[in-house]
Every structure is written in structure tokens, then in C-alpha cells.
């Protein structure tokens, strides 16, 4: 079997060149001593599935050398320690076929199959829904950027499945990028954000996690999460302002049959069904009779009672009449003095005029007045700024702020609960939903 230039370039690595004594004298440059292979740990990790039942068999030493992975310094190296042979979604009926191209990536470390080129019916770890994504993820340098749940309407492309040419690899990369961008657009993400997240996730997944843990089965958030602007105040038909009832009802020409009032906060009825104003109706309800229309005459004030004089100082004018212990009427000054000192007020303290003083406003009344003034000022300020507090303005302000995602960055749309396959997650994102949900 002839060895292509790519095989020769891959096999003659610097490790072989540094140790010329390992070259076999009879097999040329394409043979390397088996003692130089990393068989202790790396091969056990990469071929842990093959070690269970099927053992590799190589037809010639060139193909045996080709089956081993590149040195550990390669940036595309990935060791899948998460996969096991008991995965429930392995499909034995589908086969990826014997891809024996000259690329070092032609053999994935996952399939549980014999490594001989004529081995029939190998198992596949890829979902059997799409063969184009299977072949792209199998032979592309970006080995593990395939989505876990590709769409079913993707048809196999023979140009992609053919291996062994550089144009095929580039075309496969373009197809992977197109598929990732289409998934990002289906999630309604911003174009710039989707491109940055897709590039970050692709590099991170090829270095950390080969397969996304959660499939993209969670639907995107629909418009039901955020109410439309019409509900907030965009249209007057949704939240129609109810007309407040008039404070003083004067419709239909109603008139109180008792006092003749035409305006009242609340119209009532008497026993015969006639309309009464609120005052007459309450009076009739409480007393059982009609409310009197003529107010009774106020009795004379205590200061002007005829024939009344103070029993102590004989004065006839006072602001308030009091009574002493014997029941005799006394003026306000004599009554207070006796109440405080238990003796009659001396006559030397009598004055012709009534001494009055300017009463200071109590603290309670001051507080009530201040609160009333502050409420008036606040209502005036609200009336002046009424346009800024309208529902339409509030809706504009609310829609101008995008929602926050779980990572603290402002996104244009809410992020789904589980990351999609187009945005693979990595372990260097401490605020991802996967680590938060356990």
C-alpha cells in the first residue's frame, strides 16, 4: 500500500526526528517503534470502549501507525472521558462507514468497532437522524461541534461525506457554521451576540465537553412572557379609564321633598319612595321623622346671662361660668383659683377687664397642617408632571430597558433554561445555568 504525502508528513513527527535510533532499518520513515507510543494512559482513555469486546487488528504497519492519535501538544486533541459503552442513544443499526482517508482525524475514538478496514457493521455514537452532520463531525478538524439533536430534514450530501480532500474539509466547516447560525437565529438572539457566543462555545466545547449535556428541547420564550405595549398603555381600548361618578349628583332634575335641595352627594328615598337628600334621608332614618328645616335659636352665652353674678367677686362678665363647692355660680377666674388652691380667690386680684391671651397652636394641629400642605404640594407637582407619568410614557420607559440574563449581562431576549446546541457551554463559565442547576 502506498503512503500519501499527508501520511508521510503526519508520521514523520518531530518526536520521530529527534530519536533517529527508533527508526526501523527495514521499513523506512513511515514506521516507528511501538515503545514510543503513548500506550499507558492516552490509548486507554481514547479506546476505552474498544477494550471491552472488540480488539483492533491492523493489516499493515502503516495503518497501525495511522490509528494512533497525534501528540499531546496538538490544539485539536480531545479526550472524551464522559462517554461510556452503556449510553442509551447508541444506534447499532446505523454505521458511519469505513472512512479510511489520509487525514489523521478519520477515526473517532468513540465507535465501538473493530479497527480493521473491512470490519462490517460498526456502532455509531452519533444520533442517527442526520448523516451529513455525522460525516461532518467525523472528519472535520472541529471534531465535536456537531449538535446533539440535528434537524431531520437535512439530507445527506455526498460532497460532504467524501473524505481525503482539503476542499471537503472547508465545505464541512462552512456547513457547521451555517447550521450553528441557523439555530442561533431560530432562538431569536441578536446576530452579533449569536456569532460571538457560537465561536466561544465551539472552541470551548472542543476543549472541554465533546457533547452538550442538555438537548435543545426547551422552546424559546414566546411573546407571552412580556405583555405587548398595548396592554401597558399603548391603546386606550385595552385599559379604558372608567368614568368616575360625579361627586354631587344633579341629574334628572331631582329635588329633596323635605328641604328642596337639588345637589347632594347621595340621593336617598323615604318610606313613600320620594327622593331625599343625604342629610334629610339620614335624619329620617335615625330619628324616624323629617329633618326640621328651621334651626332652633341658640341660647344666650353664659357670659350674657341676665342676673348672674359671681358669688366671690360679684362680677357679671366672664367667659365661662363655674360653680363652687356649695353650688353657687362663680366666674371663670374665681372657679379656677379655687380649683387649684382650694381657697377662694382674693378680691385684690380682681380686674375690670377680662384678660385674654393669644393661644398658641398645639403640636397636633401643627402636624396636621404641615401634612395637609405637603399633600397639596405633592398633588400640584403630580399635576404638573402628569404627562411624564402617563401609561404611554411608562410603556416607552419599560420597553427601553432590556431584560437581564442569569449572567448579569443585558440581552435583547430572555435566555432559555437549557443552553442550545448552537451555544455550547464550557466549564470556564461560572454563571452558566447548567452549573447553577446542578
Swiss-Prot record:
It is found in: Nucleus. Keywords: Activator, DNA-binding, Metal-binding, Nucleus, Repeat, Transcription, Transcription regulation, Zinc, Zinc-finger. A zinc finger (GATA-type) spans 256-280, 310-334. Residues 122-142, 232-241 have a biased composition (Low complexity). The keyword Metal-binding applies. Its main location: nucleus. Residues 160-169, 410-438 have a biased composition (Polar residues). Residues 1-27, 100-173, 232-255, 350-378, 405-438 are annotated as: Disordered. It comes from the Eukaryota. Gene3D superfamilies: Erythroid Transcription Factor GATA-1, subunit A. Pfam families: GATA (PF00320). Signal peptide: none annotated. SUPFAM superfamilies: Glucocorticoid receptor-like (DNA-binding domain) (SSF57716). GO terms for biological process: cardiac muscle tissue regeneration; cell fate commitment; ectodermal placode development; ectodermal placode formation; embryonic neurocranium morphogenesis; embryonic organ development; fibroblast growth factor receptor signaling pathway; fin regeneration. One of its GO terms (cellular component) is nucleus. InterPro entries: TF_GATA-2/3, Transcription_factor_GATA, Znf_GATA, Znf_NHR/GATA. SMART domains: ZnF_GATA. Residues 357-370 have a biased composition (Basic residues). The keyword Ribonucleoprotein does not apply. One of its GO terms (molecular function) is DNA-binding transcription factor activity, RNA polymerase II-specific. This is Transcription factor GATA-3. It comes from Danio rerio (Zebrafish).
Amino acid at each position: 500500500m502506498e503512503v500519501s504525502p499527508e501520511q508521510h508528513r503526519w508520521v514523520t513527527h518531530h518526536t520521530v526526528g529527534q530519536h533517529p535510533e527508533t527508526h526501523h532499518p527495514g521499513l523506512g520513515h513511515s514506521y516507528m517503534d511501538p515503545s514510543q507510543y503513548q500506550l499507558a494512559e492516552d490509548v486507554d482513555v481514547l479506546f476505552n470502549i474498544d477494550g471491552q469486546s472488540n480488539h483492533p487488528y491492523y493489516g499493515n504497519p502503516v495503518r497501525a501507525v495511522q490509528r494512533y492519535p497525534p501528540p499531546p501538544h496538538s490544539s485539536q486533541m480531545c479526550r472524551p472521558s464522559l462517554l461510556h459503552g452503556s449510553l442509551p442513544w447508541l444506534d447499532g443499526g446505523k454505521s458511519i462507514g469505513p472512512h479510511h482517508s489520509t487525514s489523521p482525524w478519520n477515526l473517532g475514538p468513540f465507535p465501538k468497532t473493530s479497527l480493521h478496514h473491512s470490519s462490517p457493521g460498526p456502532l455509531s455514537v452519533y444520533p442517527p437522524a442526520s448523516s451529513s452532520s455525522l460525516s461532518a463531525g467525523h472528519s472535520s478538524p472541529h471534531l465535536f461541534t456537531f449538535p446533539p439533536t440535528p434537524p431531520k430534514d437535512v439530507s445527506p450530501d455526498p460532497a460532504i461525506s467524501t473524505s481525503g480532500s482539503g476542499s471537503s474539509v472547508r465545505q464541512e466547516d462552512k456547513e457547521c457554521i451555517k447550521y450553528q447560525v441557523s439555530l442561533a437565529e431560530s432562538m431569536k438572539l441578536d446576530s452579533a451576540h449569536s456569532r460571538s457566543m457560537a465561536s466561544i462555545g465551539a472552541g470551548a466545547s472542543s476543549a472541554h465537553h465533546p457533547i452538550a449535556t442538555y438537548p435543545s428541547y426547551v422552546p424559546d420564550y414566546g411573546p407571552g412572557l412580556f405583555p405587548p405595549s398595548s396592554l401597558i398603555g399603548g391603546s386606550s381600548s385595552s385599559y379604558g379609564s372608567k368614568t368616575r361618578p360625579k361627586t354631587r349628583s344633579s341629574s334628572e332634575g331631582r329635588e329633596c321633598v323635605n328641604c328642596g335641595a337639588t345637589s347632594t352627594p347621595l340621593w336617598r328615598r323615604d318610606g313613600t319612595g320620594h327622593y331625599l337628600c343625604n342629610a334629610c334621608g339620614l335624619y329620617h332614618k335615625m330619628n324616624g321623622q323629617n329633618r326640621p328645616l328651621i334651626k332652633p335659636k341658640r341660647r344666650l352665652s353664659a357670659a350674657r346671662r341676665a342676673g348672674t353674678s359671681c358669688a366671690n367677686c360679684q362680677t357679671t362678665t366672664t367667659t365661662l361660668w363655674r360653680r363652687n363647692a356649695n353650688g353657687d355660680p362663680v366666674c371663670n377666674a374665681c372657679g379656677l383659683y379655687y380649683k387649684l388652691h382650694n381657697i377662694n380667690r382674693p378680691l385684690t386680684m380682681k380686674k375690670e377687664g377680662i384678660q385674654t391671651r393669644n393661644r398658641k397652636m398645639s403640636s397636633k394641629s401643627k402636624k396636621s397642617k404641615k401634612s395637609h400642605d405637603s399633600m397639596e404640594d405633592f398633588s400640584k407637582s403630580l399635576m404638573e408632571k402628569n404627562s411624564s407619568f402617563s401609561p404611554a410614557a411608562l410603556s416607552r420607559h419599560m420597553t427601553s430597558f432590556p431584560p437581564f440574563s442569569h449572567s448579569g449581562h443585558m440581552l435583547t431576549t430572555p435566555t432559555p433554561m437549557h443552553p442550545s446546541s448552537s451555544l455550547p457551554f464550557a466549564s470556564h463559565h461560572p454563571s452558566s445555568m447548567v452549573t447553577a442547576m446542578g
